[in-house]
Amino acid sequence: MKFAVIQFPGSNCDLDMLHAIRDSLGEEAEYVWHAETSLAGFDAVLLPGGFSYGDYLRTGAIAKFSSIMPEVLRFAEMGKPVLGVCNGFQILTEIGLLPGALIRNNNLHFICKTVPLRVANASTMFTGLYKEGEIIQVPVAHGEGNYYCDDETLLKLKDNNQIVFTYDSVNPNGSRADIAGIVNERGNVLGMMPHPERAVEEIIGGTDGLRLFESVVKAWKEEQVNA
């Protein structure tokens, strides 16, 4: 399986993402510069964290207009896996692949620590190797991770089982309904504020994030067999 790691000016988690895929997961991964216009040959797209375009205007707002974005939209429409982490999640909401928005943390401070997450939906292509209700430990590092949506959207997310991860015990940023990660209705686009790529090795704190990537590979292989 081959992963595309999209790089924007200001990305700073692209190295971690590539390392997680190549070295911990053992799959192929390549950087794709934001000015490219093709994702041919790739099986999954990863939008990493960082501060794309310096977060000017608002987080993800300028990345929305990158040349690669029409191809990311087409990729998602084809049902292929797209994962946006932190700034990547913010970009996914800006381009309309996911509902809602990420706003300033309610304490107005940058947060960088490992937090407990509850797996709210273990039936997606990203969470197939987790158990429903399982508590995992994944780092967060953001200043604008406070997920917001209106009441109608929140009800829809709950009804469609689109809430994949929630903060457990303590909500670090004020996100509505403790939301840490959501998928689109089709289930092939996941946006999450915590960084699974930083939780892939025991030596740096644990491997709870690795199963997310392993789940994607498992789902992809099953799809190839059934194709």
Swiss-Prot record:
Superkingdom field = Bacteria
Pathway info:
Purine metabolism; IMP biosynthesis via de novo pathway; 5-amino-1-(5-phospho-D-ribosyl)imidazole from N(2)-formyl-N(1)-(5-phospho-D-ribosyl)glycinamide: step 1/2
- Xref: InterPro entries: Class_I_gatase-like, PRibForGlyAmidine_synth_PurQ
Instruction: Quote the catalytic activity from the record.
Output: N(2)-formyl-N(1)-(5-phospho-beta-D-ribosyl)glycinamide + L-glutamine + ATP + H2O = 2-formamido-N(1)-(5-O-phospho-beta-D-ribosyl)acetamidine + L-glutamate + ADP + phosphate + H(+); L-glutamine + H2O = L-glutamate + NH4(+)
Catalytic-site annotation from UniProt = 86, 195, 197
Q: Where is this gene product found?
A: Cytoplasm
Which GO terms are recorded in the biological process aspect for this UniProt protein? 'de novo' IMP biosynthetic process
Q: What SMART domains does the annotation carry? A: GATase_5
Glutamine amidotransferase type-1 domain: from which residue to which, for each copy?
2-226
Gene Ontology MF terms in the entry: ATP binding; glutaminase activity; phosphoribosylformylglycinamidine synthase activity
Keyword Hydrolase recorded:
yes
Q: Which GO terms describe its cellular component?
A: cytoplasm
Listed EC numbers: 6.3.5.3, 3.5.1.2
PANTHER family from the UniProt entry: PHOSPHORIBOSYLFORMYLGLYCINAMIDINE SYNTHASE SUBUNIT PURQ
* Subunit note: Part of the FGAM synthase complex composed of 1 PurL, 1 PurQ and 2 PurS subunits.
Query: What does this protein do, in the record's words?
Result: Part of the phosphoribosylformylglycinamidine synthase complex involved in the purines biosynthetic pathway. Catalyzes the ATP-dependent conversion of formylglycinamide ribonucleotide (FGAR) and glutamine to yield formylglycinamidine ribonucleotide (FGAM) and glutamate. The FGAM synthase complex is composed of three subunits. PurQ produces an ammonia molecule by converting glutamine to glutamate. PurL transfers the ammonia molecule to FGAR to form FGAM in an ATP-dependent manner.
Q: What is this protein called?
A: Phosphoribosylformylglycinamidine synthase subunit PurQ
Write down the species: Listeria monocytogenes serotype 4b (strain CLIP80459)
Native organism taxonomy? Bacteria, Bacillati, Bacillota, Bacilli, Bacillales
Per UniProt, what is the name of the gene that codes for the protein in this document? purQ
